[in-house]
Amino acid sequence: MASFHTLKIKNITKQTPDCSVISFEMPASLSKAFYYTQGQHLTLKAIIDGQDTRRSYSICSSMVDHQWQVAVKKIPGGVFSSYVNDVLQTGDTLEVMPPSGKFGVPISTQEKTYIAFVAGSGITPVLSMIKTHLAKEPKARFKLFYLNRTVKSIIFKEQIEQLRNQYFGRLEIFYFLTKEATISICEEKIN
């Protein structure tokens, strides 16, 4: 049975006003236990206001990057998400369980086109998939349809645009916004 390990937070950054990305330091002694595949998640644990609180968050990094990152969007009234976004700091520690879950497809040697329809924070496991499949499958193509409320609420927008440039012609992105008029990054508005 998997157990929790204490991991130090290497960095915590804001992606949007209500979404933080936690980057964990990974000791060499734990790197094998924390090996992951695209689409998996980490279960985090902290004592918050005297209560043992646990939540699972999709990994948004890729093993190609040799990083362990999760994004946590603040939910109104959310105990753990508020703790991460308002209290947690670089250098703090969290209890973390090794990766689990099977949301995704294995790496292929054949030419494939992947298509993902994502809304808001649902981008987190898909970002890991985009990075991994495009890096490990030279003939792969990826089409991302990404729905958000506003431009400022687009999680990982800068990173996604960097990936589009890095994998020019292999990564297509279609943004859709529900609370703003059509703008240059968006071809149409969803009502």
Regions found by a protein language model. Name each.
Residues 2-92, 148-150, 178:
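Ferredoxin-reductase
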Residues 82-191:
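FNR/FR-type flavoprotein reductase catalytic core
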